[in-house]
Structure formats: structure tokens, C-alpha cells
């Protein structure tokens, strides 16, 4: 599989938050992406990042549908399927790609503003997937607002879900 720039690889790859961090409710959200990828989607990390890699940040990847695979430094592979979330250290990620025909996911990079007990590399199933997906869609709408108060509300809502 050939790697190319992520913008040319997806059905859509929407940066919902990328220009500035939004701080609320214990986290500083660095970036939020909603990606609907096809079988050609392959990203070498952190080459695709639009912002500098921050060592103390976290990445949460929530798979809405389909299947994706993340390759970590050291050779470990993590396969993600629908209604599943995982938290990773961005410095551990080597690459990721769509594993199959489609991979719809939300990619969130954030730094905690307080001590958080986050389970690293442990996939968690979201059993109320339809509700969770609807809430993420609402966060996506709020985070794109030009009003900073609404952005803060979106991040607070994100930490709640």
C-alpha cells in the first residue's frame, strides 16, 4: 500500500479543531478530526500532523464504523472496530490505516490539565453507540463555532461523554 498525503486519501477528513487549543473541564483539546476513510487511507505519524507533537498529550481514537489498524513503535498492532475507543500516547504511534473498505473515526488529541487516570492501549466498547455518535456529532457542530464560549462548552461536553 502506498502512503500519500491524508487529504488525498479520504472520502472526507475534516479538521474540526486545529487552529488553537480549547481548554475546559480538565482537558486542553489540541485537535479534533472526523475522518471517513476508504481502503487507500494510510498515514505515517507524526508526518501528517498540522501541529507540533506534544509529548505529554494523549490521543483518543473512537471508531464509529468500519475497521482501522494502528501500528505502534515496537511493532505492536492495534485493530479498531465500530463503537470502540482507545487512548494512546502520540509518541507511541508510528502509522495508522483503514483495514478494509471503510473506517469512520474521530481522532482527538488533548492534554490533561489535571491528573487523569487514563487506561492506555486498552480498547473499550461503547455500548450506547448511537447515543455516543449523536453526542460526538453535536460536539463537532459546537467546536466549529467562532464563539469561544461555545468552543468551551463543546470541550466540556466532550469530557462528559
Explain the meaning of each model-derived region.
Residues 85-87, 100-117:
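A short hydrophobic beta-strand segment most commonly corresponding to one strand
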Residues 68-69, 85-86, 90-96:
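Histidine-centered metal-chelating micro-motifs
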Residues 40-48, 82-83, 91, 100:
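Tight coil/turn sites that cap or link beta-strands
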Residues 62, 72-74, 90, 98, ...:
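Residue-level recognition of conserved beta-strand positions in structured domain cores
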Residues 43-44, 116-124:
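Short, charged, solvent-exposed linker or helix-capping segments at domain edges/interfaces
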Residues 106-109, 113, 128-161:
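An amphipathic alpha-helical interaction segment
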Residues 74-89:
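Short acidic-glycine-tyrosine-enriched beta hairpin
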Residues 1-78:
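Generic protein-terminus/edge-of-domain signal
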